[in-house]
């Protein structure tokens, strides 16, 4: 893991003392080792440059203070980007929804090996999960439209919830039906922030 590259691109790391930086580096190195060893047996991701994925997952923290959220939900967590690493930095209690068996097994392995007590893994699609709860923060880097993502989360948010969606070049087309939102850009990434209190019933369309 090229930790120097992370420090050069993630400004918030400047606020970490040496002890916390050392602890973070150890966990990221452990993740990298497990990612490659697990990946040799199970094809869970095509990522080759993990540093790029980490920067993409965490760069939003250079622009927005997300430290006040007590709990969060992530949709389609895959190999853990972004929520696993947001949980590592923010200490927010995150529930990761990942229906793919191999990917869910990897996330559970990471949770165990890294001692991430603030991370829970659910091997199920969020819309099929019956024990609904209100999340203060909902994140996703999944490749589905913003309206569909919001619709799938019906029952998991209230007026105090903030959606953080990691989107690409087509984001403005996806957001045509949304009256209020905020976009922060870095490189080719568009970080979309939507306050649930600004949503209407028309946004709860799982088939959008």
What are these regions (language model features)?
Residues 79-91:
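Conserved SAM-binding loop of SAM-dependent methyltransferases across substrates and taxa
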Residues 85, 95, 99-208:
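S-adenosylmethionine
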């Amino acid at each position: 893991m090229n930790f120097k590259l992370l420090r050069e691109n993630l400004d918030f790391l400047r606020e970490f003392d040496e002890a916390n930086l050392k602890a973070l580096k150890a966990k990221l190195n452990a993740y990298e080792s497990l990612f490659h060893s697990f990946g040799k047996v199970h094809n869970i991701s095509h990522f080759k440059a993990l540093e790029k994925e980490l920067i993409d997952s965490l760069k939003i923290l250079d622009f927005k203070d997300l430290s006040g959220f007590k709990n969060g939900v992530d949709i389609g967590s895959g190999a853990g980007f972004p929520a696993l690493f947001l949980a590592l930095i923010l200490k927010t209690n995150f529930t990761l929804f990942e229906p793919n068996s191999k990917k869910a097994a990897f996330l559970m392995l990471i949770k165990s090996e890294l001692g991430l007590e603030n991370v829970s893994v659910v091997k199920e699609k969020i819309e099929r999960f019956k024990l609904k709860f209100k999340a203060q923060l909902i994140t996703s880097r999944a490749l589905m439209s913003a309206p569909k993502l919001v619709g799938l989360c019906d029952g998991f948010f209230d007026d105090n919830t903030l959606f953080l969606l990691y989107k690409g070049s087509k984001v403005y087309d996806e957001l045509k039906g949304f009256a209020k939102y905020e976009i922060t850009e870095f490189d080719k990434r568009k970080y979309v922030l939507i306050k649930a209190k600004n949503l209407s019933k028309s946004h709860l369309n799982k088939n959008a």
